[in-house]
C-alpha cells in the first residue's frame, strides 16, 4: 500500500500544482483585463474631453463673433449720433449766437 499511497499523494500534488497554475493564469488574465479596461476608460475619457473642448471653443468663437458684431453696431450708432449732433450744432450755431446776443444786449 505504500506505493499506492505514494502514487495517490503524487497525483494529489500534481492536481494541486495544475490547480495552482490554473488559478495563477486566471489571476493574470483578470489583471490584464483590468489593465485593458483602465486603458480603454482613459482613452474614452480623453476622447470625450477632447470633443467637449472642441465644442467649447466653437461656441466661444461664435459668441466672440456675436459680441464683435454688437460692438461694431454700437460704435456705428454712437458715431452716427455724434455726427447728427455735430451737423445740428453747425446748422443752429448762428441762431444760438444771435439769441444769446439778443438776450444780453436787450436789457430792460
Curated annotation (Swiss-Prot):
Residues 48-89 are annotated as: Disordered. It is a peripheral membrane protein. GO terms for cellular component: cytosol; nucleus; vacuolar proton-transporting V-type ATPase, V1 domain. Signal peptide: none annotated. Pfam families: V-ATPase_G. Keywords: Hydrogen ion transport, Ion transport, Membrane, Transport, Vacuole. V-ATPase is a heteromultimeric enzyme composed of a peripheral catalytic V1 complex (components A to H) attached to an integral membrane V0 proton pore complex (components: a, c, c', c'', d, e, f and VOA1). Subunit of the V1 complex of vacuolar(H+)-ATPase (V-ATPase), a multisubunit enzyme composed of a peripheral complex (V1) that hydrolyzes ATP and a membrane integral complex (V0) that translocates protons. V-ATPase is responsible for acidifying and maintaining the pH of intracellular compartments. Belongs to the V-ATPase G subunit family. This is V-type proton ATPase subunit G. It comes from Schizosaccharomyces pombe (strain 972 / ATCC 24843) (Fission yeast).
Amino acid at each position: 500500500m505504500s506505493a499506492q499511497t505514494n502514487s495517490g499523494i503524487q497525483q494529489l500534488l500534481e492536481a494541486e500544482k495544475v490547480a495552482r497554475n490554473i488559478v495563477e493564469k486566471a489571476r493574470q488574465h483578470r489583471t490584464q483585463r483590468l489593465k485593458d479596461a483602465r486603458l480603454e476608460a482613459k482613452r474614452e475619457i480623453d476622447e470625450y474631453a477632447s470633443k467637449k473642448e472642441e465644442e467649447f471653443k466653437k461656441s466661444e468663437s461664435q459668441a466672440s463673433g456675436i459680441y464683435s458684431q454688437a460692438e461694431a453696431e454700437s460704435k456705428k450708432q454712437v458715431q452716427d449720433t455724434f455726427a447728427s449732433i455735430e451737423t445740428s450744432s453747425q446748422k443752429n450755431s448762428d441762431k444760438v449766437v444771435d439769441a444769446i446776443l439778443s438776450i444780453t444786449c436787450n436789457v430792460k
